[in-house]
């Protein structure tokens, strides 16, 4: 178990060690450590490349082993807090690299402090390791300021001192003021022989004699300054509020402190009662001097108080330093514990290991020298205070406070030197003492030089003080010179002053009434410059319901200019199938040729069609080409301009047809034909009709056109629009908004203002109209009825004397409005607009006729369509007549074909049977039977 000794903050240091122990056991620390080791390996590799020194590698290995031991080996630590020895602070799994230096340095520091205080034995109240820096001396200073915290004792004690104690001194001469000031037990002195005649008033305003009051005060003081009393409890909680046994500590340490410094054997209760009595006497004497107006006593007391405040203000710096530096030592120790992981990461690099570890150990040693220096300083100061002690009496009370103020200020000032002095002790003792001496010398020379300079310059400042709002010995050396002015008061109460240079200065404040109501007339001219930055957030909800109808009249004139240009690419594919009125005639011609050829050769129509088609061209190929060029030159009629256009194109098509037929048949036919004169005619008719009738076309074409055109168009348009619109609107609007705005603005303005105060005129108006109530109306501000009457008269005054002037100014300004503005010309009437429109329309009609623009194209097209439709109808009727003839011939040929087909079928069957008949038998089956019978016979 490793012990760590600290001055204070043991629980906080335990939390620091727990945090470090927990952090260095996590994966995060492992990752950080591996990264640091990797970087150190890279550093060693770089050094090896530069120097090829084996000692660099061995040094890195040694550092790696050392760091592993410091981090991976864990131990337990017990923190011993000197400010709270009851609690036990134990921390496990602390790295040995942190636990060993911390434990070693703190144990050495604690042992040195304990050894020093054991050799120079002092009570616990003045021992640094037990109660802190100058605790006993501070306890004595606080005890001299003990005041009763019981309100009943405070009021009664002050009256008792003023009426009873001072009366015994100055009237009855029972004891002198010097006896009271030098008495070591003023409590017994002031209550020894109280007057039975003089008295005081208690809290119930009952008169009690000094004798009776002394009994009451003694009983209350004894109870108030013992354990459980109000004053006892207040100061115990103020000094030892956080301790579990504050009453016991207060009783023991106060007695020890007074015993050490003054050799007193009184108990803490007696000491408190004595000091409360002294401070009550001091307050009572001061209050009596203030009541009697004793200026000399006030100045004396003020001087003493001023010196005490000056000393206490000086010592406050030392007190702050004495209280804060031990806590700073604890906090720095905690910081040294907290940065241990960072130091380990830095120590991984073998070039930094020794310097980092050395600096860490030196820092811990530096912090542990603080308590030793504190103990030495505390011992020296308490020894000095004991040797230069003064008795605690009323006359020495201020001197005691002064002495301990000096003691505390010196100790605090020296304690501020402990951190640099302790570091110099570690580094070099002689230089440290030299630095401290130089600081002390400069601090003493500076105020001395300042005081000497004030004396040489003659700048003195003494006795600038205030005591209980009483000013004394006021002396002013200011010089005021005033001459050459003449001032007189006018009949209205104002003042007029004529200065030395002849100017007149008027002051009308004495002639003005200050009334509960103010009436002003103001004319202002202002020029403002404003800069504003605003940031706002707005949220709104609205609902709107409305109805509207409107009537309006408008006349429009339009002028327009346009310009266009462009280019285009196109690809076209199509398939055409056409049939005209001539197709039906050619079809009839082909059918007639087929039938004639079939009859001539005594063959079927199908065979005739094939033979006629085979006599024509069986395959055909056609190629078509077309190319054209077109140009255009145009000049506009109504304006200036022209255009040139060029278009080129090419088209190619391929038409093809293929006819192929296959036929298989078996039959026997006997025919004889001697007619061949119609074959050529039938073949020619079939060929011509076939060529005319069959026409199919598939075409694909592509074209690209680029055009550039410049054109100018002048357009004249006349339009007449007449509209009437009436509009009525009714709107219901509901808006709900939430806004948050932040605005920063800067405004710079300059204004000129003329203001006239009409309060006095209103006062005269009230005197004239209500002379019997003028005072109440002009001065009574508490009555609502009077206020209402005053408001009515003020409004009447404004209407009678102020409003007419405002209205006259408004009328004059209104007449001047619009004088510098030009009149707005009125437009022409509707007849002028219609006449203008008719004139423009006549110009357009004339230019249209000059351009030979026809307007009967639709009628001409309709006539042509009607004519063409009639011709097509006649052709259709002719085709239908021929179609009926063809259908008749077709029916006849069909019947003949059926007859011939039946005859041919019969002949086919007979011929087939004849071919299948076998000699010697009528059928194969019969022939087989005969063969079997012959076989059996054999």
UniProtKB/Swiss-Prot annotation:
Transmembrane segments: 54-73, 330-350, 413-433
Localisation per UniProt entry: Cell inner membrane
Modifications the protein undergoes after translation, according to the UniProt entry: TraG* probably arises from the post-translational cleavage of TraG.
Keyword Transmembrane helix attached: yes
Cytoplasmic topological segments: 1-53, 351-412
Region annotation (Disordered) ranges: 654-677, 915-938
Alphabetical list of InterPro entries matching this protein: TraG_N_Proteobacteria
Protein name (Swiss-Prot/TrEMBL): Protein TraG
Role according to the record: Plays a crucial role in donor-recipient cell interactions. Required for two stages of the conjugation process: pilus biosynthesis and mating aggregate stabilization. May interact with TraN.
Periplasmic face residues: 74-329, 434-938
Keywords: Cell inner membrane, Cell membrane, Conjugation, Membrane, Plasmid, Transmembrane, Transmembrane helix
Recorded topology in the membrane: Multi-pass membrane protein
């Amino acid at each position: 178990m490793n012990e760590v000794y600290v001055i204070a903050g043991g629980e906080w240091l335990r939390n620091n060690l727990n945090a470090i122990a927990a952090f260095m056991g996590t994966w995060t620390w492992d990752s950080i450590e591996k990264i640091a080791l990797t970087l150190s390996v890279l550093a060693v590799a770089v050094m090896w490349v530069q120097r090829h020194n084996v000692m660099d590698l061995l040094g890195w290995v040694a550092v790696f082993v050392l760091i592993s031991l410091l981090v991976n080996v864990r131990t337990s630590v017990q923190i011993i807090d000197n400010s709270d020895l009851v609690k036990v602070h134990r921390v496990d799994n602390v790295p040995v690299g942190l636990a060993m230096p911390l434990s070693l340095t703190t144990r050495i520091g604690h042992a040195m402090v304990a050894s020093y205080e054991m050799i120079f034995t002092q009570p616990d109240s003045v021992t640094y390791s037990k109660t802190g820096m100058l605790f006993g001396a501070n306890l004595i200073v606080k005890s001299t300021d003990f005041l009763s915290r019981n309100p009943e004792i405070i009021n009664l004690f002050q009256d008792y001192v003023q009426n009873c104690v001072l009366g015994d001194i100055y009237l009855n001469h029972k004891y002198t003021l010097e006896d009271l000031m030098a008495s070591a037990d003023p409590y017994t002195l002031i209550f020894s022989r109280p007057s039975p005649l003089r008295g005081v008033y208690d809290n119930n305003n009952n008169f009690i004699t000094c004798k009776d009051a002394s009994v009451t005060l003694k009983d209350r003081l004894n109870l108030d300054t013992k354990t459980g009393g109000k004053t006892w409890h207040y100061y115990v909680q103020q000094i030892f509020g956080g301790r579990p046994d504050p009453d016991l500590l207060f009783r023991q340490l106060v007695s020890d402190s007074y015993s050490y410094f003054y050799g007193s054997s009184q108990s803490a209760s007696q000491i408190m009662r004595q000091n409360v009595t002294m401070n009550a006497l001091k307050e009572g004497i001061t209050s009596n001097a203030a009541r009697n107006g004793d200026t000399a006593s006030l100045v004396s007391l003020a001087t003493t108080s001023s010196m005490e405040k000056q000393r206490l203000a000086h010592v406050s710096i030392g007190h702050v330093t004495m209280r804060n530096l031990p806590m700073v030592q604890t906090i720095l120790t905690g910081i040294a514990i907290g940065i241990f992981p960072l130091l380990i990461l830095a120590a991984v690099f073998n070039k930094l290991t020794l310097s980092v570890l050395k600096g860490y150990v030196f820092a811990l040693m530096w912090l542990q020298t603080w308590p030793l220096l504190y103990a030495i300083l505390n011992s020296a100061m308490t020894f000095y205070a004991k040797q230069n002690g003064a008795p605690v009496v009323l006359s020495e009370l201020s001197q005691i406070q002064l002495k301990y103020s000096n003691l505390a200020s010196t100790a605090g000032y020296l304690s501020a030197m402990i951190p640099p002095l302790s570091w110099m002790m570690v580094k070099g003792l002689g230089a440290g003492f030299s630095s401290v001496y130089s600081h002390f010398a400069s601090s003493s020379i500076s105020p001395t030089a300042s005081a000497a300079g004030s004396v040489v310059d003659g700048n003195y400042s003494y006795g600038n003080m205030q005591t209980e709002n009483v000013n004394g010995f006021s002396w002013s050396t200011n010089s005021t010179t005033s001459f050459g002015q003449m001032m007189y008061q006018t009949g209205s109460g104002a003042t007029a002053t004529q200065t030395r240079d002849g100017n007149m200065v008027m002051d009308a404040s004495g002639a003005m009434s200050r009334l509960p109501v103010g009436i002003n007339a103001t004319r202002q001219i202002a020029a403002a410059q404003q800069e504003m930055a605003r940031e706002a957030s707005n949220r709104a909800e609205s609902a709107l319901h409305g109805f509207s109808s409107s009537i309006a009249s408008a006349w429009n004139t339009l002028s327009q200019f346009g310009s266009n240009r462009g280019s285009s690419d196109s690809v076209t594919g199509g398939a055409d199938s056409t049939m005209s009125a001539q197709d039906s005639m050619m079809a009839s011609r082909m059918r007639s040729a087929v039938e004639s050829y079939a009859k001539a050769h005594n063959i079927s129509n199908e065979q005739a069609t094939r033979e006629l088609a085979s006599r024509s061209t069986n395959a055909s190929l056609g190629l078509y080409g077309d190319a054209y060029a077109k140009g255009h030159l145009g000049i506009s009629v109504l304006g200036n301009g022209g255009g040139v256009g060029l278009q080129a194109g090419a088209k190619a098509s391929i038409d093809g047809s293929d006819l192929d037929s296959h036929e298989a048949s078996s039959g026997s036919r006997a025919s004889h034909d001697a007619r061949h004169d119609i074959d050529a005619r039938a073949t020619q008719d079939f060929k011509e009709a076939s060529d005319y009738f069959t026409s199919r076309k598939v075409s694909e074409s592509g074209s690209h056109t680029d055009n550039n055109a410049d054109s100018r168009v002048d357009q004249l348009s006349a339009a007449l629009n007449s509209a009437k619109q009436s509009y009525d609107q009714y709107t219901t609007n509901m808006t709900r908004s939430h806004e948050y705005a932040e605005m920063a603005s800067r405004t710079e303005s300059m204004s000129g203002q003329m203001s006239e105060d009409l309060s006095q005129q209103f006062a005269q108006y009230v005197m004239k109209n209500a002379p019997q109530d003028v005072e109440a109306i002009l001065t009574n501000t508490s009555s609502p009825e009077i206020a209402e009457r005053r408001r009515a008269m003020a409004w009447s005054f404004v209407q009678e004397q102020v409003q007419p002037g405002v209205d006259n100014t408004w009328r004059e300004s209104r007449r001047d409005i619009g004088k510098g503005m030009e009149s707005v010309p009125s437009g022409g009437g509707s007849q002028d607009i219609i006449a203008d429109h008719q004139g423009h329309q006549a110009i357009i009609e004339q230019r249209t006729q000059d351009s030979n623009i026809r307007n009967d194209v639709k009628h001409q097209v309709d006539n042509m369509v009607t004519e063409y439709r009639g011709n097509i109808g006649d052709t259709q009727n002719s085709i239908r007549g021929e179609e009926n003839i063809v259908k008749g011939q077709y029916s006849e040929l069909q019947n003949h074909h059926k007859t011939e087909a039946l005859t041919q079928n019969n002949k086919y069957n007979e011929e087939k049977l004849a071919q299948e008949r076998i000699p010697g038998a009528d059928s194969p089956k019969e022939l087989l039977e005969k063969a079997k019978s012959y076989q059996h016979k054999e």
